[in-house]
From Swiss-Prot:
Task of the protein: Catalyzes the NADPH-dependent reduction of 7-cyano-7-deazaguanine (preQ0) to 7-aminomethyl-7-deazaguanine (preQ1).
Protein species of origin: Prochlorococcus marinus (strain MIT 9312)
Transmembrane segments: none
Protein name (Swiss-Prot/TrEMBL): NADPH-dependent 7-cyano-7-deazaguanine reductase
SUPFAM superfamilies referenced in this protein's UniProt entry, alphabetically: Tetrahydrobiopterin biosynthesis enzymes-like
Active site: C50, D57
Gene Ontology molecular function, alphabetical: preQ1 synthase activity
Main location: cytoplasm
Any single Gene Ontology cellular-component annotation: cytoplasm
Pathway connected to this protein: tRNA modification; tRNA-queuosine biosynthesis
Length: 136
């Protein structure tokens, strides 16, 4: 292990931290607007902090949606989700905020967000939020 001193650059945010901090959900045009189909996205490494203890909370997020005019771009979604890692926020609030942002940015016909939080203190929690009307 090196014992070299670190320079001032350790005080500035690293490039990855800057990218995450500036992230937003980006969408692109649905390549087949006439077809009804579902897209499923898994984000297994979601983290935020408990607003009471400051301890990290971990969850697996699953998004299933029927796109309308646009589709979520996956890298931007990953970076947007990573932005919550240092935020002190309740499970209920963070999942509702994510759903609001997904609906506002992508305007899907229908969307379901499931957040399965890892157990802490022998208690686990799962939230399911739906928006829109599912089409067949």
């Amino acid at each position: 292990m090196s014992t070299a001193k670190l320079d001032d650059s350790t005080q500035r945010p690293l490039y990855g931290e800057r990218i995450i901090e500036e992230s937003k959900i980006i969408c692109f045009e649905n390549p087949n607007k006439k077809r009804i189909y579902e897209i499923s996205i898994q984000l297994p490494e979601f983290t935020c902090k408990c607003p009471f203890s400051g301890y990290p909370d971990f969850a697996k997020l699953n998004i299933i949606y029927q796109p309308n005019l646009s589709v979520y771009e996956l890298k931007s979604l990953k970076l947007y989700i990573n932005n919550f890692r240092d935020i002190k926020i309740s499970h209920e609030e963070v999942v509702n905020r994510i759903m609001d942002d997904l609906v506002n940015e992508g305007s899907p016909h229908w969307i379901h967000l499931n957040a399965a939080f890892n157990p802490r203190g022998n208690v686990s929690m799962q939230l399911d939020i739906f928006s829109g009307q599912k089409r067949n």
